[in-house]
Structure formats: C-alpha cells, structure tokens
C-alpha cells in the first residue's frame, strides 16, 4: 500500500465496530477527509490522542479500499485548554462546525485561519465573541460579501446609518432598506472594523465597547445562515 503524510485538525468522528473510529479531519494538503483509526478505542492504543476533537498534527496514512487508514500520528497541538473551559469549548466547537460547513477541497488560507483562531482561543483570555466574530467575518468575506463599506451597495450614497440586507447579503442605506434588513449600530460597525483589521495575535490589544461584539455575533450568525443555510452553533 502507498502511504502519505498530511497536516490536519480533527473535526470529530464516529465510533464503528468494537474498537475502531472514523475520523473527520480538515487537512492542509487535501481539505476535508474521512480517515479510519483501527483499534484506537483500546486502552493501550498508540493513536488514542489522534481521535480527539481539536487535535492538530501530522497523520501518516495508507491507502485503503474505500477509506484511508491512519498508521501513525505526531501531535503538534491538541489545544487541551479548550476542553477544560466550558465557554472556550463551546466556542471552539462552533468554529470547527463552521469550518465543516464551508470546507471541501484544499484551502491553505482557511487552514491557517482556523489554526490561528483555535490557538488564540486556547492560549489567550479574550472577551467572549472576539474570536468567533473574526472567524465568521473572514468566512463571509471569503464568500464574497463585504461588511466594511462606506457606501450603500444599491444607490452608492455615503452611509450615515447601515443596514444589512439579508436577501442579498449587502449593506444598504435607510432609503434602500426593506423589511428583511437588520440595523447595524455604530458600536457594531466599529467592532467589525477593528476585528477585521487585527490579526488573531493582536486581538488582545484591542478593546471593543457598547456590546458591539455581541451584536456583531448575532448579525454575522444570521447572515451566515442566509448565505449558506447553516445555523451557527450557540456559544451561550
């Protein structure tokens, strides 16, 4: 059998047979894959750590008839801190669920984005919503929708008040809004701008106010649902 190595993060899995597990991973090289871990539910299995959600490392795999088989694993980071803090755990699960919803083939920028998000979530104590807001904003931007505009997408007038048109996923002015528009407050817009312009490593240096990050989470979650049909997991 031919073997290969991939760098991947575990999204989740399903127990099969008596001791095996099917693993869902997102890899740098090939995108989303399903892999088989043989005998991994045995107490002395050398691959036990590889079956855990959030685990990031290098998988050594062999080609199988239908599903490739993991034969070795070198952990890079298992982000264990996420499993010891319930709020971080919920936020981390929501991030991986979003990744699972949009990922398919190889996407190196998305891979780097999710590792950066989980690393910051695990090792920094940031206010709630900062990280998932930035991750959602990046996903929506990658889908081709821009929140950070100074002009109405319909009439091009300079914006003094902003509304998200959920029908088209674009920002409009008061004159162009309809019944399916959501108001974006100045605090929310300021939060979106700061989060977008800051790297994950620099999020600890910014301070948002007026509950802008919470409003941003609600608006981004609603917009993501309208754009993809996928409901963002609750982190409350």
Segments the model singles out, each with a brief description of its role:
Residues 1-21, 26-236:
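Non-catalytic alpha-helical scaffolds and adjoining flexible linkers that form interface surfaces
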């Amino acid at each position: 059998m031919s073997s290969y190595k991939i760098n991947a993060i575990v999204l989740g899995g399903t127990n099969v047979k008596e001791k095996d597990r099917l693993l869902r991973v997102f890899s740098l090289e090939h995108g989303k894959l399903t892999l088989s871990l043989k005998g991994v539910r045995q107490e002395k299995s050398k691959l036990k750590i590889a079956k855990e959600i959030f685990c990031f490392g290098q998988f050594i795999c062999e080609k199988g008839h239908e599903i490739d088989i993991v034969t070795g694993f070198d952990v890079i980071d298992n982000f264990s801190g996420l499993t010891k803090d319930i709020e971080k755990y919920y936020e981390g699960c929501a991030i991986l669920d979003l990744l699972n919803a949009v990922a398919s083939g190889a996407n190196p920028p998305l891979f780097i984005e999710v590792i950066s998000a989980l690393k910051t979530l695990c090792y920094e104590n940031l206010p709630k919503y900062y990280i998932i807001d930035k991750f959602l904003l990046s996903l929506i931007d990658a889908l081709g929708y821009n929140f950070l505009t100074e002009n109405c997408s319909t009439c091009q007038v300079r914006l003094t008040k902003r509304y998200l048109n959920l029908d088209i996923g674009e920002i409009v002015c008061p004159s162009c809004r309809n019944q399916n528009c959501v108001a974006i407050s100045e605090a929310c817009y300021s939060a979106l701008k700061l989060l977008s312009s800051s790297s994950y490593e620099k999020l600890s240096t910014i301070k948002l106010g007026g509950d802008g990050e919470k409003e941003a989470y609600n608006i981004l979650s609603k917009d993501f649902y309208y754009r993809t049909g996928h409901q963002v997991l609750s982190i409350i």
